[in-house]
């Protein structure tokens, strides 16, 4: 088989891709186990929890957006969203100007469950945190994995990374670290934070 000339060494590319594949597989095995143990008390699977996570961030996402940002097939996104609707965690809707797409949104029960899941998170039971602990001890923070994020951006696009970043900034904004637990901010604190953010933006404009 003829290969067109590449701007890099083919053997180097092979070793890189296989190194990434095998490390990702090993890492995913640990992450999958941690994730399943975390959500097991709520009788959720990983796809269902991921859908709740995305629905919380997007506040009215279409099924196609859930599939795109959840890295799953559209039928998978729809079927698991339907199960979450049956359990009262999601509500489905159509838009008057867009009858083709189905949109989902968290119900009060779904939002409460999402909050409880974050509050129940225990880093002591998380293999990925334990594995990164020595790096945190040395540098005072967890790895930022910037090179990995650059690769993902080049594969999945800027929109994907914008939602990815937004999801974590929303958690930063809406939740507190309180006595070793992640807890939802009170409405008073949220209003105060929103006011401060608006004031900061106004000052930047001036």
UniProtKB/Swiss-Prot annotation:
Region named Disordered: 186-206
DNA-binding region, residue range(s): 63-86
All copies of domain HTH marR-type, residue ranges: 13-157
UniProtKB keywords: DNA-binding, Repressor, Sporulation, Transcription, Transcription regulation
SUPFAM superfamilies from the UniProt entry: Winged helix' DNA-binding domain (SSF46785)
GO BP terms: negative regulation of DNA-templated transcription; response to stress; sporulation resulting in formation of a cellular spore
Disulfide bond among keywords: no
Coiled coil: none
Gene Ontology terms, MF aspect: DNA binding; DNA-binding transcription factor activity
Family annotation (PROSITE patterns): HTH_MARR_1, HTH_MARR_2
Pfam families named in the record: MarR
UniProt key word DNA-binding: yes
Role of this protein: Negative regulator of protease production and sporulation.
Assembly behavior: Homodimer.
Stored HAMAP family: HTH_type_Hpr
PANTHER family assigned to the protein according to its UniProt record, in alphabetical order: DNA-BINDING TRANSCRIPTIONAL REPRESSOR SCOC, TRANSCRIPTIONAL REGULATOR, MARR FAMILY
The name this protein goes by in its record: HTH-type transcriptional regulator Hpr
Species per Swiss-Prot/TrEMBL record: Bacillus pumilus (strain SAFR-032)
Lineage: Bacteria, Bacillati, Bacillota, Bacilli, Bacillales
């Amino acid at each position: 088989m003829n290969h067109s000339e590449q701007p890099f060494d083919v053997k180097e590319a092979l070793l890189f891709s296989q190194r990434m594949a095998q490390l990702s597989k090993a890492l995913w095995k640990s992450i999958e186990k941690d994730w399943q143990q975390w959500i097991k008390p709520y009788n959720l699977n990983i796809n269902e929890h991921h859908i709740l996570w995305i629905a919380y961030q997007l506040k009215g996402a279409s099924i196609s957006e859930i599939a795109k940002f959840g890295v799953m097939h559209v039928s998978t996104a729809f079927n698991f969203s339907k199960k979450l609707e049956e359990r009262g965690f999601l509500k489905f809707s159509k838009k008057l100007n867009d009858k083709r797409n189905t949109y989902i949104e968290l119900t009060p029960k779904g939002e409460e469950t999402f909050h409880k899941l974050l509050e129940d998170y225990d880093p002591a039971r998380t293999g990925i945190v334990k594995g990164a602990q020595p790096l945190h001890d040395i540098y005072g923070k967890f790895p930022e994995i910037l090179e990995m994020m650059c690769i993902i951006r080049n594969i999945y696009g800027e929109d994907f990374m914008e939602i990815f970043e937004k999801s974590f900034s929303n958690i930063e904004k809406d939740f507190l670290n309180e006595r070793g637990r992640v807890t939802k901010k009170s409405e008073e604190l949220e209003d105060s934070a929103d006011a401060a953010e608006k004031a900061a933006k106004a000052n930047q404009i001036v």
